[in-house]
């Protein structure tokens, strides 16, 4: 499932998925969060956890975070999460800022699209066992548009979030 929203690669719509994740964590479920955008901050979960009166420490033990600092690291994390899912029995897998990695100009376009297709096939396979949410934002370039086009056959659903008072959210 692609969840697209305002902000750089869906930065603002991430709050929605964080809320879903906190709810699952507070109920004793595990969550995998793969960060491809170098922006994951677990402290953003704390206010919602406190409001649900759940133990932050206990909840964070069930939050499995993977950070890919390069495209190849992100690819390895996505491939590996299938094996981890068998152990953790996670209720959701979040891939945050994935397409940002594929826009790196140092990666050849053919290689980039090939890795993207492999990642998407792996995630599509994972989605048979557990919901997979890919976060992204509005298209930023022609290459970004091409990458989204490559994603379409692999997506079961595509949701777009939009804030009513966009100017006030800045």
Task: List each language-model region with its residue ranges.
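Short, basic, glycine/proline-bearing loop/turn elements
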Residues: 2-6, 64-67, 108-109
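Glycine-rich P-loop/Walker A and Walker A-like loops and their local beta1-loop-alpha1 context
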Residues: 1-35
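Structural motif
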Residues: 2, 92-96, 133
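Catalytic-core regions built around general acid/base machinery
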Residues: 20-23, 115-129
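Conserved inter-motif catalytic segment of the P-loop NTP-binding fold
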Residues: 34-105
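Alpha-helix N-cap and loop-to-helix initiation/capping positions
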Residues: 107-115
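Phosphate-binding/switch region of NTP-binding enzymes
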Residues: 124-170
């Amino acid at each position: 499932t692609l969840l697209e929203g305002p902000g750089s690669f869906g930065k603002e719509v991430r709050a929605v998925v964080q809320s879903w994740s906190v709810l699952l964590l507070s109920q004793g479920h595990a969550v995998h969060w793969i960060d491809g955008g170098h922006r994951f901050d677990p402290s953003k979960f704390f206010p919602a956890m406190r409001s649900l009166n759940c133990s932050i420490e206990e909840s964070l033990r069930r939050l499995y975070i993977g950070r890919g600092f390069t495209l190849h690291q992100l690819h390895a994390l996505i491939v590996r999460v299938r094996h981890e899912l068998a152990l953790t029995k996670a209720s959701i897998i979040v891939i945050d800022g994935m397409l940002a990695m594929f826009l790196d100009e140092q990666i050849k376009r053919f290689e980039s699209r090939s890795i993207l297709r492999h990642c998407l096939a792996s995630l599509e396979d994972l989605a048979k066992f557990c919901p997979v949410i890919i976060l992204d934002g509005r298209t930023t370039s022609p290459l970004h548009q091409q990458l989204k086009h490559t994603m379409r056959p692999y997506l079961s659903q595509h949701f777009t979030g939009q804030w009513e008072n966009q100017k006030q959210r800045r």
